[in-house]
Regions:
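Conserved N-terminal entry element of GNAT/NAT acetyltransferase domains
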Residues: 1-12, 153-156
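Acetyl-CoA-dependent GNAT
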Residues: 8-12, 19-74, 79, 92
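Alpha-helical elements of the RecA-like P-loop NTPase motor core of helicases
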Residues: 15, 117-118
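Short hydrophobic/aromatic beta-strand or adjacent loop that forms the aromatic wall/cage
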Residues: 46, 143-149
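Short, well-ordered beta-strand micro-motif
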Residues: 50-52, 148-152
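Conserved acetyl-CoA-binding loop-helix of GNAT-fold acetyltransferases
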Residues: 84-97
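Conserved GNAT acetyl-CoA-binding A-motif
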Residues: 99-112
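Conserved catalytic-core motifs of GNAT/GCN5-like acyltransferases
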Residues: 108-110, 121, 125-145
Length: 156
């Protein structure tokens, strides 16, 4: 596998990042009459990362601030050809490092994929704190709720 590097997202990276998110049914969508408050309506470029291999974007993730010391992760996705190669862990580590440097102490994550829930708990020390109903079909179409996880960054 090619060497993978993680860096901050640039505007020119958006089409590739959106393509990868779309592969997992996680692309942001604008508000509409049918879905006035979508799960994700955009990507905050200042808080977004990409993983790159051989000049090609192979993964993306971001986060947004909920308060001075609270943040929520947003849509980590990896090109299926690179799944299982550690790209997701590199992206997650980059965003957690940046959050720590910004003074974030508490991180919230929502996911609907059982393997991703296990990954967050076992690899990063998250704990499951509840569920939230989905606003519309996003990510897995047959799951109508998010599992909510939290991570105490001050303990790591």
């Amino acid at each position: 596998m090619s060497e993978v590097t993680v860096r901050k997202m640039r505007e020119a990276d958006l089409p590739a990042a959106l393509r990868i998110l779309g592969l997992w049914n996680m692309a942001p969508r604008p508000p509409s009459a049918d879905v006035p408050d979508p799960e994700r309506s955009g990507i905050e470029l200042a808080n977004a990362f990409v993983a790159e291999a051989d000049g090609r974007i192979v993964g993306t993730c971001s986060y947004f601030m909920l308060g001075d010391d609270w943040a929520e992760t947003a849509s980590l996705a990896v090109d299926p050809a690179f799944k299982g190669g550690g790209v997701g862990a590199l992206l997650q580590a980059a965003r957690l490092d940046e959050m720590r440097h910004r003074g974030v102490r508490h991180v919230r994550t929502e996911t609907d994929r059982p393997e991703t829930i296990r990954w967050y708990v076992e690899r990063f020390g998250y704990r499951i704190v509840g569920t939230n109903p989905k606003k519309h079909t996003f990510s897995l179409p047959d799951v109508d709720y998010w599992t909510v996880l939290e991570l105490d960054l001050s303990a790591n």
